[in-house]
């Protein structure tokens, strides 16, 4: 074939690779979701298989089996050798149901609960109002019935993996009893206590969420070290008797005035010398990134009245609330890239 005679792309023109990758991002997430919901990774955990065997195990046609296997291999979820497929280390660890770090619940929660609001992201940008559907938008988004149980279940592993890195990165040797405010189903405090045998604490959340936390705490064998306290942190005083308060992935749900109120309530419950720990995906102080924090902030735009904030903003709020020795500790995890900590004067 003769070479083309056209002039081609002018020198210096950037390739559109970034745009095609962004435009088709949904294809990747839905491929992962389809693989989880059809049981692909669970099926391959029983042994490698070719396309016809995979189709038989999943009860699907050979054509979709081949396409799904190829896509998952291209995405780094499967390995292929001589026409046979098996789970990669990542898939084997995180995507097989029943294993301790199973991540599929989070993926399904995003697909079923979070995605509908994202499909109306332009509306959220134009109206400055959440677009994520809730049964009763006039009620608190966290009240019973306004968030499905799958939300709390899906976040459990996500929160556990985040807490694991927090526990390894932040010095908690001087803390004896910690209060996890807005602690959900208890994943964060369970993991912190698992990593630090000297710790005990309290999960504070709404009554129906505390019921879920109680079940998880019992299943983890932590009932002697972790209790629950039902409270609305905007309306009720927080329980005393703790020397640290943790706010893990909480303040991004609310606006600045609400967050200042939450911090004031936390400090009221602490003795002098007690520590407040804010664990979040921190936006860079110049608001240029990073990607995970910036996109989580977009997630807050479509789902809440909050946003992700900078470390500098949290530092100012803690100091204004009466904290000294404010510092930031950085680490990498699914739900946080750092902790901003302050000591009550």
Swiss-Prot record:
Per the UniProt record, which EC number(s) apply here?
2.1.1.302
Q: Which residues form the active site?
A: 252
Residue ranges that the Swiss-Prot or TrEMBL entry lists as coiled coil: none
Q: How is its activity regulated?
A: Inhibited by different divalent cations, such as Mg(2+), Mn(2+), Fe(2+), Cu(2+) and Zn(2+).
State which pathway it belongs to.
Antibiotic biosynthesis
Report the top EC class in one word.
Answer: transferase
A GO BP entry is:
antibiotic biosynthetic process
Q: Entry's InterPro entries?
A: COMT-like (IPR016461), O_MeTrfase_dom (IPR001077), Plant_O-MeTrfase_dimerisation (IPR012967), SAM-dependent_MTases_sf (IPR029063), WH-like_DNA-bd_sf (IPR036388), WH_DNA-bd_sf (IPR036390)
**By its UniProt entry, which PROSITE patterns does this protein fall under?**
SAM_OMT_II (PS51683)
Q: A Pfam family matched by this chain, by name?
A: Methyltransf_2
Q: What positions does the entry give for S-adenosyl-L-methionine binding?
A: 205
Family of the protein in this entry: Belongs to the class I-like SAM-binding methyltransferase superfamily. Cation-independent O-methyltransferase family.
The protein depicted here goes by the name: 3-hydroxy-5-methyl-1-naphthoate 3-O-methyltransferase
Q: Which organism is it from?
A: Streptomyces sahachiroi
Q: Which gene encodes it?
A: aziB2
């Amino acid at each position: 074939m003769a070479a083309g005679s056209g002039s081609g792309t002018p020198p210096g023109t950037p390739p559109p690779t970034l745009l095609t990758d962004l435009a088709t991002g949904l294809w990747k997430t839905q491929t992962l979701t389809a693989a989880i919901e059809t049981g692909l990774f669970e099926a391959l955990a029983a042994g490698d298989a070719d396309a016809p065997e995979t189709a038989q195990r999943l009860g699907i046609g050979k054509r979709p089996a081949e396409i799904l296997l190829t896509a998952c291999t291209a995405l780094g979820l499967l390995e292929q050798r001589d026409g046979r497929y098996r789970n990669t280390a990542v898939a084997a660890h995180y995507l097989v149901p029943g294993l301790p770090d199973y991540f599929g619940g989070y993926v399904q929660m995003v697909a079923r609960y979070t995605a509908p609001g994202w499909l109306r992201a332009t509306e959220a940008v134009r109206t400055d109002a959440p677009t994520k559907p809730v049964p009763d938008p006039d009620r608190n988004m966290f009240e019973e019935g306004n968030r499905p149980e799958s939300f709390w279940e899906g976040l459990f592993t996500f929160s556990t993996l985040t807490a694991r890195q927090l526990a390894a990165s932040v010095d908690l040797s001087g803390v004896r009893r910690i209060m996890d405010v807005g602690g959900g189903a208890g994943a964060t405090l369970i993991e912190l206590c698992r990593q630090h045998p000297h710790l005990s604490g309290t999960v504070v959340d709404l009554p129906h969420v505390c019921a879920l936390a109680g079940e998880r705490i019992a299943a983890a064998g932590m009932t002697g070290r972790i209790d629950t306290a039902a409270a609305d942190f905007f309306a009720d005083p927080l329980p005393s008797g703790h020397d640290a308060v943790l706010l893990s992935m909480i303040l991004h749900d609310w606006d600045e005035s609400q967050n200042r109120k939450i911090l004031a309530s936390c400090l009221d419950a602490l003795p002098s010398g007690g520590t407040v720990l804010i664990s979040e995906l921190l936006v860079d102080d110049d608001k240029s990134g990073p990607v995970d924090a910036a996109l989580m902030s977009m997630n807050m735009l479509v789902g809440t009245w909050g946003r992700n904030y900078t470390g500098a903003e949290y530092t100012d709020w803690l100091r204004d609330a009466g904290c000294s020795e404010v510092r930031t500790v950085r680490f990498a995890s699914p739900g946080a890239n750092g902790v901003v900590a302050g000591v009550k004067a």
